[in-house]
Amino acid sequence: MSIEVRGLSKRFGAFRALDEVSLHIETGELVALLGPSGCGKTTLLRIIAGLESADAGSVLFAGEDATEVDVRQRQVGFVFQHYALFKHMTVFENVAFGLRVRHRSQRPSEARIRAKVLDLLGLVQLDWLADRYPAQLSGGQRQRIALARALAVEPRVLLLDEPFGALDAKVRKELRRWLRRLHDELHVASVFVTHDQEEALEVTDRVVLMNAGRIEQVGSPREVWERPATPFVYGFLGDVNQLHGHATRGVWRLGEVALPAPDLPEADNQRAIAYVRPHDIDLARAGTAAPGIPVRLNHVYLAGPSAYLELARQDDQAIIEAQVPEPLFRSLGLKEGEALLAQPRRARVFAVQP
């Protein structure tokens, strides 16, 4: 079942949480709402679920207006960050809860409930824990039980609010890949909130970048990473250097360095900022003929397969960060304090707004 929101707005006092947000999610899509704290992503998720009401706009499921439909009638599965499992109930009872509290006319028989719960526990690969209590489970196991409970009511859509936020990094990575495989089996529209860029880019079909209550960009993980639509998206999706220069007729310049600026074909000495990823900066020793930004190597941080270099520009001491493979760094024999040239290889150029 598809999900569509049209012109959603929401205020909490003077704070505007959502500002005319519109979005369409197809059946079977796994979509991430990604952004910093306070950007509106959780508010949007809760309005879709029916846990929050909008000041304006509408929510449609499969083309039908669900804005005024009670949360209990929306057939939405919701998974919270902190599991919200009932401590006094076993795993089996937690998963069965949503089925047992249905109105008598809609409640399955106890035999069907048992079969359904055991099927779901098998689906999340935890059927052997049916008689345990939440306190006896790991964080990853609790989150999978919470997901099984959400699926028990056969939701038309699945909504997850930072489902892996309370887990350590290794478990998060394992669970999000497991969620991707599970989602492909279920084939329902699924939306999850996260502030983890890697998480959103790794497992989703599309990423919705949000900022200050608005959508900045919607696209596939590859699209938003390779072609960020705004400076905010560029900065939020990873480390980035901002180099201030000028653009003229589609070319950005800073000293001897020139880079294409295809989005500014009519610019005439216009102030513009080149956004450059650390791994898109090459290094050369000072005195070579190639153009570059004169810098001095301040510090080197080695982390696994990469070396992260902190470079200070020689004109204004502004910091430029570069990332190179550790074997290359070793072969170059660079020393802290050495004069170098930073050579941006690729960038996205945005005009400075007056």
Curated annotation (Swiss-Prot):
- UniProt key word Transcription regulation: no
Q: Look at the named UniProt entry and state the broad enzyme category this protein falls under.
A: translocase
Q: Mind telling me which InterPro entries this protein's record contains?
A: AAA+_ATPase, ABC_SmlMolc_Importer, ABC_transporter-like_ATP-bd, ABC_transporter-like_CS, CysA_C, Mo/tungstate-bd_C_term_dom, P-loop_NTPase, Sulph_transpt1
Question: Matching Gene3D superfamilies, A to Z?
Answer: P-loop containing nucleotide triphosphate hydrolases (3.40.50.300)
Which positions bind ATP? G35, P36, S37, G38, C39, G40, K41, T42
Q: Which UniProt keywords apply?
A: ATP-binding, Cell inner membrane, Cell membrane, Membrane, Nucleotide-binding, Sulfate transport, Translocase, Transport
GO cellular component labels: ATP-binding cassette (ABC) transporter complex
Q: What does this protein do?
A: Part of the ABC transporter complex CysAWTP involved in sulfate/thiosulfate import. Responsible for energy coupling to the transport system.
Q: How does it assemble?
A: The complex is composed of two ATP-binding proteins (CysA), two transmembrane proteins (CysT and CysW) and a solute-binding protein (CysP).
Protein name in UniProt = Sulfate/thiosulfate import ATP-binding protein CysA
Q: What's the gene? A: cysA
